[in-house]
Amino acid sequence: MFKLKSRRSNLLKFHRPKLQLNEAPIPVLKLESKQCIQNLLNYQPPKIRLQIPRSRCAAVLVALFVGRTGDLYVLLSRRASTLRTYAGDTSLPGGKWDAQDHSIEWTARREAFEEIGLPMDRQKVPLLCVVEPFLAGNQLVVIPVVVLILDNTLRPILNAPEVASLFSHPLISLLHSEPPFSTEPEMLEMKYHTYVDIAAHEGHVRMHRFLTGREAGGTKPIFGLTASILIRVAAIGYGREPDFEVFAPDQPSWEERLAHVLRHHLVFREAAQQEGIDPDKTAGSKTDDAHPGARRGRVRSKL
């Protein structure tokens, strides 16, 4: 669990799920999908003792739902072309923590409500789990919040200045290098899954890209942070690693990356100091999994 220096309730407290599978009105559900949901419900992220400044925290909502044939899909949005940053990108609903947010789950739900009109009702959209943090461009710490949409009658209400369109993608396809959809002749030379390794401190970070099958209509592939988050959620849910290499050979662990930005990046140092956190002290902290064998022995603890 994160330790944030404040007398207020812990912003990043991991909430316990309220969903019981045998009570939920889920449509026809494949055994594989049911096991995925159960695995997500049971997931306990590694404990972290890094002190992270709240002003550099953000959350995204990984909203899953059951499709007509019993498979699990994730909701994705196409960002408006008029946005100043990441215009037109494929993304998950989410945004920065607000001072009025009493938890990181609340941040994710609030942003999803504002962007796509997804109700904040935990009965209709119960929590499955909260996943360990990711770094977004060395500027923000992003925490994925995974939920399950039980009410299939819900209709999106898009915030046009922020969201151009909404679509879904099969979750399990984030574990495969082959496409889940039929490929058009003109796209045969385009691989469904590709990656590029970006230089980072003491190594590289692998950035994945997946086609959505909607590129002809202007939708961009699932790329970078969004792809990494969905790979992680799919691996937790389906209980197996992808059929491709997730990490670069020299990729630092996610706790090493967090410690590095807390100590060396100005935006994090200034934010930490403003919130009464010693960035040098917190950057020297360790997670429960930060032993010498953690990087290779437990690859799921990495970004």
Q: What is the predicted role of each segment?
A:
Residues 1-163, 172, 177-180, 184-303:
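N-terminal leader/linker segments that precede catalytic domains of diphosphate-processing enzymes
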Residues 169:
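Cofactor-binding loops of NAD(P)H-dependent oxidoreductases
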